[in-house]
């Protein structure tokens, strides 16, 4: 059996297990990871490289930073402040989505989510609303906000790089032509109809540090202040990532280490704050994304779908197929891998049709950002699985309508703003 076929079998297995949850999500990920090694599709280094992926390192660091906010009670104090201004659950959801959406346009969407997840959990604790209803809008807003600027998401820069040899480019805010209407529509949706379909789970505290009932009266004031100062410093380091030349994950690690070294959080509590289910789920799933890439299975799927359109497909229909194909792929591969895979295919077909490559790539990028229906679609989705006590189906129920909204808006705006034959 060829490596491509084996990879597709593991993909099908993962989809079925993720949807049915007959076994835990993290266990499914590890079965796939180890299975790809046993079958010879990947070597050990490639299969387990996901566990030293920069996003996993960022997860670990920000779990500790978030844990410090909770251990000191600062997250609850921030929550109290926010709830004074947003009196209702709907108001909180709108406020969270607006703040996260705007921040994601200028800071990476993963970095934005990583910084604000502990804050939102604190808001949930003080407001009395279930965190499962606040965290999902947060990560969806992070994904939508990534399409407000050139630097909002890695896929945006990949598309820009693909255009460079052709002497073409996207403007800094050109993604917002499509991205901003989707963000606005998404916020309105979850403030109205979507409000009713958000998950409504009680959280499993276990021995997690994120204890909403803890008494913080004995915590020294300096610990609270220092935890907030380090959080803000970490955020600023992430915002100015390009200028200071330090990657997000390293900035997060510096913040986490400072919290431990200064005694704001103990080593024991720092380790307790790390959600291992999230780490195993994300790290293991990256092996599947790697296999789809190196075996050509992902390219095979794309080629078969695009090839079925024929030599001269309708521009609108072709745009729709590219958009939806990227939507599907990005929910099982990363946004970055999806755009990197699809960009050369789309460019080749666009040039063959004599179409504007920018039109096709914009559909590719926007579709590739619609990672709303699985917990593995983007790092932020995975980060909140444990905190929100989410199941796979929760993402599908809450995220699928958002994909429909994004598709409708894109198919209206793309032909007007980025015509195939300008």
Q: Residues of each region from the PLM?
A:
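Transmembrane alpha-helix interface/packing and boundary motifs in multi-pass membrane proteins
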Residues: 14-23, 99-109, 140-151, 237-243, ...
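Membrane-embedded alpha-helical segments and adjacent helix-loop junctions characteristic
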Residues: 31-34, 38-130, 273-278, 282-353
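Hydrophobic transmembrane alpha-helices of multi-pass small-molecule transporters
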Residues: 1-60, 64, 177-303, 319, ...
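Hydrophobic alpha-helical membrane segments of integral membrane proteins
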Residues: 27-32, 109-117, 136-137, 148-152, ...
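Alpha-helix N-cap/start motif
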Residues: 44, 131, 172, 248, ...
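Helix N-cap/coil-helix junction residues
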Residues: 22-23, 41, 74, 129, ...
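Juxtamembrane and boundary regions of transmembrane helices in multi-pass small-molecule transporters
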Residues: 6, 127-140, 146-158, 162-214, ...
């Amino acid at each position: 059996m060829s490596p491509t076929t084996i990879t597709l079998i593991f993909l099908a297995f993962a989809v079925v297990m993720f949807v049915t949850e007959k076994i835990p999500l993290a266990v499914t990920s590890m079965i796939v990871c180890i299975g790809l090694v046993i079958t010879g599709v990947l070597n050990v280094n490639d299969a387990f490289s996901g566990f030293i992926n920069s996003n996993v390192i960022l997860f670990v660091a920000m779990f500790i930073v978030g844990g410090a906010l909770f251990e000191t009670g600062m997250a609850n104090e921030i929550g109290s402040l926010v709830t004074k201004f947003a009196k209702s659950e709907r108001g909180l959801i709108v406020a969270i989505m607006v703040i996260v959406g705007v921040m994601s346009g200028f800071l990476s969407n993963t970095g934005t989510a990583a910084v604000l997840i502990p804050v939102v959990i604190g808001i949930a604790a003080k407001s009395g609303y279930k965190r499962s209803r606040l965290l999902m809008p947060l990560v969806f807003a992070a994904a939508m906000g990534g399409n407000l600027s050139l630097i909002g998401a890695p896929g945006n820069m990949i598309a820009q790089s693909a255009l460079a040899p052709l002497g073409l480019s996207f403007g800094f805010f050109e993604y917002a032509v499509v991205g901003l209407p989707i963000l606005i529509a998404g916020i309105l949706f979850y403030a109205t109809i979507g409000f009713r379909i958000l998950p409504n789970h009680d959280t499993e505290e276990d021995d997690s540090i994120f204890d909403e009932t803890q008494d913080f009266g004995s915590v020294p004031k300096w610990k609270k202040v220092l935890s907030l100062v380090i959080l803000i410093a970490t955020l600023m380091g992430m915002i100015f990532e390009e200028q200071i030349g330090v990657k997000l994950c390293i900035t997060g690690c510096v913040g986490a280490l400072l919290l431990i070294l200064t005694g704001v959080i103990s080593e024991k509590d720092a380790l307790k704050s790390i959600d291992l289910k999230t780490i195993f789920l994300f790290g293991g799933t990256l092996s599947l994304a790697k296999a789809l890439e190196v075996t050509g299975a992902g390219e095979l799927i794309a080629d078969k779908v695009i090839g079925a359109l024929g030599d001269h497909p309708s521009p609108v229909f072709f745009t729709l197929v590219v958009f939806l194909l990227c939507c599907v792929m990005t929910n099982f591969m990363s946004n970055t891998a999806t755009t990197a895979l699809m960009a050369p295919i789309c460019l080749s077909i666009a040039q063959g049709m004599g179409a504007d490559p920018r039109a096709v790539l914009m559909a590719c990028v926007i579709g590739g950002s619609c990672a709303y229906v699985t917990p593995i679609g983007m790092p932020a989705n995975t980060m909140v699985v444990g905190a929100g006590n989410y199941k796979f189906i929760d993402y599908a129920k809450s995220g699928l309508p958002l994909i429909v909204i994004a598709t409708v808006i894109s198919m209206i705006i793309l032909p007007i703003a980025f015509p195939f034959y300008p």
